[in-house]
């Protein structure tokens, strides 16, 4: 039996427990560095809460915090304490995703430019690369730990690395490469889902047979039965790339009908950690 007095966040095969209370973690993705106005963060969190979410997932952008090797600075609009405080005031739990690689559709995936001169192979255990991440990980890890629910803060989950297979997804489908017990496996297994892709030029073409998953719940039970069903990223919109067709088509692609059908479909599979990437106009 796990002692909830000792651990603030635990889980079983059904859901997370936060301070002993069973919850469904339903979160929206929001990145403070994309809206670098700390005075607006509480308003954003309150609106997210009003939409029915109880959590927010966020990336940390290493490139903005360590512009030169060994010089870490998370101050001013890049300070995270106001972000954590605003989440606490709004009653929002946080899911921290500090990378060091984040992708996030940013230049270099959030890597600082000076890392290109590193002699080690990036995203491996080569010492030159690992040593280059030490200063960032030590500082951001300390900030996140201080804001953990165990220390009275809002952070309840942390994702190590991001989109490791290979560059643009956390398992794009339920394969089971990273499940508890396997080398490098996390505590809780999860996969991503972008069933409609990003063809904003022809959004209606996505409504075809085969787009709606029918077996995700069963697949989860087969490959990670001891953890709650988790989707750390599920489609909440689409990307309009440079020279694309325009955001109007993207709004049609992932509209209210998509949300009603696909989100409820995931609820039917028993998802208990469900993160929408991204929310509203915060991207």
Task: Put a short name on every predicted segment.
Residues 97-100, 149-165, 172, 179-180, ...:
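Aromatic-lined carbohydrate-recognition surfaces of secreted/lumenal glycan-active proteins
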Residues 76-98, 117-157:
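An active-site-proximal structural segment forming one wall of the substrate-binding cleft
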Residues 24, 52-54, 88-94, 149-156, ...:
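Short, well-ordered coil/turn segments that N-cap beta-strands
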Residues 20, 48, 56, 87, ...:
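Conserved, mostly hydrophobic/aromatic
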Residues 40-109, 178-181:
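Aromatic-lined substrate-binding rim segments of carbohydrate-active enzymes
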Residues 152-223:
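Gly/Pro-rich turn-and-neighbor structural signature
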Residues 1-55:
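N-terminal carbohydrate-binding accessory modules
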Residues 85-88, 92, 178-180, 201-283:
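Catalytic-core region of carbohydrate-active enzymes that cleave or remodel glycosidic bonds
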């Amino acid at each position: 039996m796990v002692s909830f007095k000792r651990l603030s966040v635990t889980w079983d095969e059904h859901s997370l427990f936060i301070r002993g209370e069973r919850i469904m973690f339903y979160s929206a993705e929001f990145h403070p560095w994309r809206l670098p106005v700390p005075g607006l963060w509480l308003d954003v969190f309150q609106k997210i809460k009003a939409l029915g979410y109880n959590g927010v997932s966020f990336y940390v952008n290493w490139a903005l915090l360590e512009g030169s090797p060994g010089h870490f600075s998370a101050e001013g609009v890049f300070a995270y304490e106001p972000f954590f405080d605003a989440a606490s005031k709004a009653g929002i739990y946080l899911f921290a995703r500090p990378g060091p690689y984040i992708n996030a559709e940013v230049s270099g995936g959030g890597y600082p430019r000076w890392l290109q001169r590193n002699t080690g192979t990036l995203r491996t255990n080569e010492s030159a690369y690992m040593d280059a991440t030490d200063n960032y990980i030590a500082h951001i890890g300390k900030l996140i730990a201080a804001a953990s629910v165990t220390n009275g803060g809002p952070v309840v989950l942390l994702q190590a690395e991001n989109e490791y297979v290979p560059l643009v997804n956390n398992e794009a489908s339920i394969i089971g490469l990273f499940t508890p017990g396997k080398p490098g496996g996390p505590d809780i297994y999860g996969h991503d889902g972008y069933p409609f892709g990003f063809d904003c030029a022809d959004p209606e073409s996505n409504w075809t047979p085969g787009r709606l998953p029918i077996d995700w719940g069963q697949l989860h039970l087969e490959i990670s039965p001891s953890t709650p069903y988790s989707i750390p990223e599920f489609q909440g919109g689409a990307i309009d790339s440079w020279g694309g067709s325009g955001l109007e088509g993207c709004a049609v692609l992932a509209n209210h009908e998509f949300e009603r059908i696909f989100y409820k479909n995931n609820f039917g599979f028993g998802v208990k950690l469900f993160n929408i990437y991204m929310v509203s106009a915060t991207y």
